[in-house]
Swiss-Prot record:
Its main location: cytoplasm. GO terms for cellular component: cytosol. PANTHER family: ARGININOSUCCINATE LYASE. It comes from the Bacteria. Pathway: Amino-acid biosynthesis; L-arginine biosynthesis; L-arginine from L-ornithine and carbamoyl phosphate: step 3/3. It comes from Leuconostoc citreum (strain KM20). Its EC number is 4.3.2.1. It is found in: Cytoplasm. This is Argininosuccinate lyase. SUPFAM superfamilies: L-aspartase-like.
Length: 462
């Protein structure tokens, strides 16, 4: 491949090959080849429309770019590190195909606004995939929540048994988190859906370009209204990484619970063989490796966010070469997020829930203590006093290995005369769950209503 520099005229000496290799980005920004061609086609059409170049020249350039796009789709394009980046590689290939007229493509354009446009397009094209994947994950969670709206389990604070809840209620909590993730990625589209092209290097151009035409051709909803901002803004990429970090944090929290709950100590759930691995030495092992990998890749995502924040934190306006370092993190995190969501969707769709074990966990853990305290409060006992009374009963129960619901009525009444025989119904896990009827509570009827509400939210996306 013939090599050239877009900026060679100013220089009298040629850089060493190893220096050029250090500055090259083609090994990663080739991922934007389709976007670079797409942006160039729109730009070439605009140049012809505005008579900045002739219509025949515009048509010839567009035809050459379309041919390159087909070769790209067919896996026939080869890029050369000596041509530094995707923009120079495409221009060299176009020149080989149509000759010197290819040099007119860069009229009224800089690589500064060109790369910003490519990057915007790349993220813009892929954000819908994230939204679709999140929708599928939420649908899977809702299907599972529907099956387990009444499956009773222990709820936890500080990883200690707290109060009985339903597994469906637990799953809906993650649905809420993923809904917020969806909303953030959806809003991310607004700042991604802006066209930088036309800002040129930093100050705009003297040519009579039509930026709105290019925006329409590329499907952008708006244009940047300040040329300095257009070439130096990477907020949309930082928003994506920040949103991805929060999403991965949510997945990681759930992964931790899946890992814990699949152990013999908990035995609440079992992951399918498709999403488990074994040991090379211990025949009995069934490891939650894929949940662990999602948890591990969360740190990778955090690192990408911090890397780009650090890169951008002291850059003067407008473009700086530091910004070449903006893409690898985004490319990697996009792949990571899509893979992690897919893994979770599959893992949850094949999960086995041990309902009896979940219910059993609520029988001897004193998680019904709050029910007794609330019961006393309804009998006129100040809650703080009721709390202390029940605390003493729990201590007695621990010492005698007797759950509250198994204590004799006389012993309960010795601690609090207000207690009557109906307390045994109150202390049942099912009663404890279904008494939580406040909005957002864990009562089965609430969970069912919430499932219906969240399904409506998903239907509204269609």
């Amino acid at each position: 491949m013939t090599t050239t520099k877009l900026w060679g005229g100013r220089f009298t000496a040629k850089a060493a090959e190893w220096v050029d290799e250090f500055g090259a980005s083609i090994h990663f920004d080739e991922q934007m080849a389709a976007e670079d061609i797409e942006g160039s086609i729109a730009h070439a059409k605009m140049l012809g429309k505005q008579q900045i170049i002739s219509e025949s020249e515009s048509a010839e350039i567009v035809a050459g770019l379309v041919a390159l796009k087909k070769e790209l789709d067919d896996g026939m394009l080869a890029f050369d590190v000596k041509n530094e980046d995707i923009h120079m590689n495409i221009e060299v290939l176009l020149t080989q195909k149509i000759g010197a007229v290819a040099g007119k493509l860069h009229t009224a354009r800089s690589r500064n606004d060109q790369v910003a446009t490519d990057f915007h397009l790349w993220v813009k094209h892929r954000l819908p995939h994230v939204l679709d994947a999140l929708t599928e994950l939420q649908e899977t969670l809702l299907q599972l929540a529907t099956q387990h709206a009444g499956t009773i389990m222990s709820g936890y604070t500080h990883l200690q048994h707290a109060q009985p809840i339903t597994y469906g209620h637990y799953l809906l909590a993650y649905c809420e988190m993923f809904q917020r993730d969806y909303d953030r990625f959806e809003f991310n589209q607004k700042h991604t859906d802006m066209l930088p092209l036309g800002a040129a290097a930093l100050a705009g151009t003297t040519f009579p370009i039509d930026r709105d035409f290019v925006a329409e051709q590329l499907g952008f909803n708006d244009i940047y209204h300040n040329s300095l901002d257009a070439v130096s803004d990477r907020d949309f990429a930082l928003e994506f990484l920040s949103n991805a970090a929060m999403l991965m944090m949510h997945l990681s929290r759930m992964a931790e619970e899946l890992i814990l709950w699949s152990t013999y100590e908990f035995n609440y759930i079992e992951l399918s063989d498709d999403f488990s691995t074994g040991s090379s030495i211990m025949p009995q092992k069934k490891n939650a490796d894929f949940a662990e990998l999602v948890r591990g890749k969360t740190g990778r995502t955090y690192g990408a966010l911090m890397a780009l924040l650090t890169t951008m934190k002291a850059l003067p306006l407008a473009y700086n070469k530091d910004m070449q370092e903006d893409k690898e993190q985004v490319f990697d995190v996009m792949d990571t997020v899509l893979a992690a969501i897919k893994i979770f969707t599959g893992m949850l769709s094949e999960i086995t829930v041990h309902k009896e074990r979940m219910l059993a966990s609520t029988q001897d853990d004193f998680s019904n203590a709050t029910e007794l305290a609330d019961y006393l409060a309804t009998k006129g006992v100040p809650f703080r006093e009721a709390h202390a009374i029940v605390g003493q009963l729990v201590l007695t129960g621990i010492q005698t290995h007797t759950p509250l619901q198994n204590m004799a009525l006389a012993d309960l009444q010795a601690a609090a005369p207000q207690i009557e025989a109906d307390i045994y119904l109150v202390l049942q896990s099912e009663t404890a769950v279904n008494r939580r009827t406040s909005i957002g509570g864990t009562a089965v009827a609430n969970v069912q209503k919430e499932i219906a509400r969240q399904y409506k939210n998903l239907e509204a996306r269609q």
